[in-house]
Amino acid sequence: MTKKIKTLNLNFGPQHPAAHGVLRLILELDGEVVEKADPHIGLLHRGTEKLIENKTYMQAVPYFDRLDYVAPMNQEHAFALAIEKILKINVPIRAQLIRVMFCEIGRILSHILNVTTQALDVGALTPSLWGFEERETLMTFYERASGSRLHANYFRAGGVHQDLPMGLAEDIGNFCESFPKIIDDLETLLTDNRIFKQRNVDIGIVTKEDALDYSFSGVMIRGSGVPWDLRKSQPYDCYEQLEFKIPVGKNGDCFDRYLCRIEEMRESVSIIKQCLSKMEKGPIKSLDGKISPPPKKDIKQSMEALIHHFKLFTEGYRVDKDEIYTAVEAPKGEFGVYLISDGTSKPYKCKIRAPGFSHLQAMDYLIKGHMLADVPAVLGSLDIVFGEVDR
């Protein structure tokens, strides 16, 4: 007598602590083995792209902080670059260095959270406690520069909102001296840890060809052996003046992606040090009064400055009729902004290309044939944040 084997359907999330947000995965299980994984997204959809259409270019910046809210300034960077390309604005070198420095701080913020929570998902508690301590220091730097720990609203078309406060550059420099020791300590806990390796080596393997077919970017494609990094291949701001290496994996598994993130943190520290050494006094935003607000002291003394300020904050600046795509190397991968302007002070359309969206699409391919307990390990190595996936 033949027996028909029935698979079991299991809901993973949306309230599971390892789902990293509001992911709902419908898993089809044959015993402990995952036969199929069906991600259901949209539980954090806020209509960001539509909301941006009703805001001026300056008012739209905070929406980008709320996409990948682990490293907010990296998204603002893409939007600022898109406007600058259409308006053909030259950004002062000091502003470029400040922007690159804070983008690399964002990369460390994102990677340290991912590496430590991935370890937490497979049972290692200590790294996350150490990691959050370092993230606290970095968020204090964010707060001192922009006034906000998380949603910075700091980058502007033509530069940054305000200059670095007194003593911040020195404190960031001191952090760069002490942080590599923390990375070494994390590696001591995890890299040669037998349990951590058993949970990550040969799990969620992605070949070079499949990584390209699924349009992976960032660590997901570099972990599979493709040395693709927009900071090198399509440099923006002052990245071509900086020296750094691109860590590349061999096997394309969860462990290689973890190693890539660890090495990228070291490279980010090196980039921040270079930015600090190159930084000299100078303007921190475009001097065009039609785009950048005047300094506060000028508003009290000059009628022209007062008019510029009033027009900028009521009507906003007009952007020439054009369309453009700009992409930056965000911590999760290629974050792109496709901006269409119709000559008014509000975008006609702003399409956002979130890297996490492409990575989550491959969840079924990545987890098929693995055990149920491997789902959090694979999901952790994808580095998903739902602000940008659901938009």
Swiss-Prot record:
**Enzyme class per UniProt:** translocase
Cellular component annotations (GO), alphabetically ordered = plasma membrane
Cellular compartment(s): Cell inner membrane
What's the EC number here? 7.1.1.-
Membrane-protein topology: Peripheral membrane protein
Predominant place of localization = membrane
By its UniProt entry, which Pfam families does this protein fall under? Complex1_49kDa
Q: Which reaction does it catalyse?
A: a quinone + NADH + 5 H(+)(in) = a quinol + NAD(+) + 4 H(+)(out)
Family under the similarity heading: Belongs to the complex I 49 kDa subunit family.
Please report the name of this protein according to its UniProt entry. NADH-quinone oxidoreductase subunit D
Q: Where is the signal peptide?
A: none
The record's annotation in Gene3D superfamilies points to: Cytochrome-c3 Hydrogenase, chain B (1.10.645.10)
Protein keywords: Cell inner membrane, Cell membrane, Membrane, NAD, Quinone, Translocase, Transport, Ubiquinone
Q: Which organism is it from?
A: Pelagibacter ubique (strain HTCC1062)
Q: Which GO terms describe its molecular function?
A: NAD binding; NADH:ubiquinone reductase (non-electrogenic) activity; quinone binding
Query: Which SUPFAM superfamilies does the record cross-reference, listed alphabetically?
Result: HydB/Nqo4-like
- Assembly description: NDH-1 is composed of 14 different subunits. Subunits NuoB, C, D, E, F, and G constitute the peripheral sector of the complex.
Question: What is the purpose of this protein?
Answer: NDH-1 shuttles electrons from NADH, via FMN and iron-sulfur (Fe-S) centers, to quinones in the respiratory chain. The immediate electron acceptor for the enzyme in this species is believed to be ubiquinone. Couples the redox reaction to proton translocation (for every two electrons transferred, four hydrogen ions are translocated across the cytoplasmic membrane), and thus conserves the redox energy in a proton gradient.
